[in-house]
Amino acid sequence: MEIFRNNELIGYNYYFFKTKNDEVHVTNQIKLTVKLLAVTIFEIESFGEEKYNNDKLISFNSTTKQNNKKKFVNLVLDTKNNKFIIKGSSYSGEASTNNVIGNWWNHKLLQAESQISPVSGSIKKQAVTFIAKEKIELYGKSYETEHFKIKSRSGFIDLILL
């Protein structure tokens, strides 16, 4: 998917899905640059892999360069204790399996009370608000969308889903 800010293309966030029997493998690539008056104020490039078995997250790994800082997440499901074990650049420890990886493809993100940052592994409580159904135009085509706002202590994301 393309990422726009003020109707200007600023990057991409691509997802690739592979399924085999009860397993789903999701690969994610993101790159975006935000400029203000021709000065770069935010830049990110990331690669991540999620693995699910029977719709249950069993592992997640990512490497990210954000504003010239290297960040990472290595997460595995401890099936014996039904908890995630996270080693990340901002958090290392255990997490409840009620948490969702904060990637935009997963509609469960909109139903979760907290998310695991796909950049650093930190756990963020969130509040999701449905704003409205909206119609947007891209490249001469009209799309019906749903507009949500996701708030956390670190700010908010204004998210429009096709």
Identify the meaning behind each predicted range.
Residues 3, 51, 136, 161-162:
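Hydrophobic alpha-helical segments, especially N-terminal targeting/anchoring helices
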Residues 3-79:
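N-terminal mature ectodomain segment of secretory-pathway/periplasmic proteins
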Residues 6, 61-154:
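Solvent-exposed helix/loop surface patches that form functional interfaces
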Residues 16-24, 104-105, 142, 160-162:
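Short, surface-exposed loop and linker segments with low hydrophobicity and enrichment for Pro/Ser/Thr
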Residues 27-29, 43, 144-162:
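Gly/Pro-enriched, hydrophobic low-complexity segments
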Residues 38-40, 139-140, 159:
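Short histidine-centered beta-strand/loop micro-motifs
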